[in-house]
């Protein structure tokens, strides 16, 4: 089975959203990521519309709060028919457990429980920021591994991490875990605000379960062609 290429819809209004989606083809063949920018501007109705149209949705809100609040937030999100959602691993094991419990409690009967992905270190975080601003003395790869192990032990279904860390995670955690990787840039594309990036081919070779790609698709002159090319390279 093909591993998904998830289109990051980092847009701020439904007009932009509809314009991009109209160029990507059959909704049943498209997996999209809705993050804070679109969700906070367009609201919960945009998720309902997308699911009704047949899109698979990764709702990326990166919950990070006390366990009870995250439980109730996850419980509400589970009612929306989404496929993936996220928490920050730095919120700790009890918060992750509460998020998973909330997703289970909120999922309607007969529906699949959304997969819970824990964000390790954002792909915009460099080694210098990790060391000098987060005051973490571990190398980036070791920090990500530590957070990923804790997330799996706490009930997460996978992690969000840079493709640069995936091979090490496979070796130390195993293959029964999702490794979803943003920071994907086809050869020749600008890094933009990402620090730890890789091409779709590299992500494939290192073992990413799914990749998240935004601007190289949404800003392309032909978004569908760009999407199909990236899917071909990744699979």
Swiss-Prot record:
InterPro entries in UniProt: Aldolase_TIM, OMPdecase, OMPdecase_AS, OMPdecase_bac, OMPdeCOase_dom, RibuloseP-bd_barrel
Q: Pathway, according to UniProt?
A: Pyrimidine metabolism; UMP biosynthesis via de novo pathway; UMP from orotate: step 2/2
Tell me what reaction this enzyme catalyses: orotidine 5'-phosphate + H(+) = UMP + CO2
Coiled-coil stretches? none
Keywords linked to the UniProt accession: Decarboxylase, Lyase, Pyrimidine biosynthesis
What do the Gene Ontology cellular component annotations say? cytosol
* UniProt-listed GO biological process terms: 'de novo' pyrimidine nucleobase biosynthetic process; 'de novo' UMP biosynthetic process
**What Pfam families does the record tag this protein with?**
OMPdecase (PF00215)
Oligomer status and interactors: Homodimer.
UniProt lists the family membership as follows: Belongs to the OMP decarboxylase family. Type 1 subfamily.
Question: What name goes with this protein?
Answer: Orotidine 5'-phosphate decarboxylase
Which organism encodes this protein? Answer: Lactobacillus acidophilus (strain ATCC 700396 / NCK56 / N2 / NCFM)
């Amino acid at each position: 089975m093909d591993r998904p290429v998830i289109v990051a819809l980092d847009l701020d209004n439904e007009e932009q959203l509809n314009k991009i989606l109209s160029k990507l083809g059959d909704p049943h063949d498209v997996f999209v990521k809705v993050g804070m920018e679109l969700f906070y501007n367009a609201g919960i109705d945009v998720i309902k519309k997308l699911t009704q149209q047949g899109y698979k949705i990764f709702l990326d809100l990166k919950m990070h709060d006390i366990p009870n609040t995250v439980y109730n937030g996850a419980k509400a999100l589970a009612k929306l028919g989404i496929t993936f959602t996220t928490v920050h691993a730095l919120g700790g094991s009890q918060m992750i457990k509460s998020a998973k419990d909330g997703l289970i409690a909120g999922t309607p009967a007969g529906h699949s429980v959304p997969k819970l992905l824990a964000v390790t270190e954002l792909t915009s975080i460099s080694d210098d920021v990790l060391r000098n601003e987060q005051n973490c003395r571990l190398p980036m790869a070791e920090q990500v591994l530590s957070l990923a192990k804790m997330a799996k032990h706490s009930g997460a279904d996978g992690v969000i991490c840079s493709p640069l860390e995936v091979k090490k995670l496979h070796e130390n955690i195993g293959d029964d875990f999702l490794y979803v990787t943003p920071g994907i840039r086809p050869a020749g594309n600008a890094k933009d605000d990402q620090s730890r990036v890789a091409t779709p081919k590299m992500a494939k070779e290192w073992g990413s379960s799914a990749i998240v790609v935004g601007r190289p698709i949404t800003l392309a002159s032909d978004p569908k062609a760009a999407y199909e090319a990236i899917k071909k390279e990744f699979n």
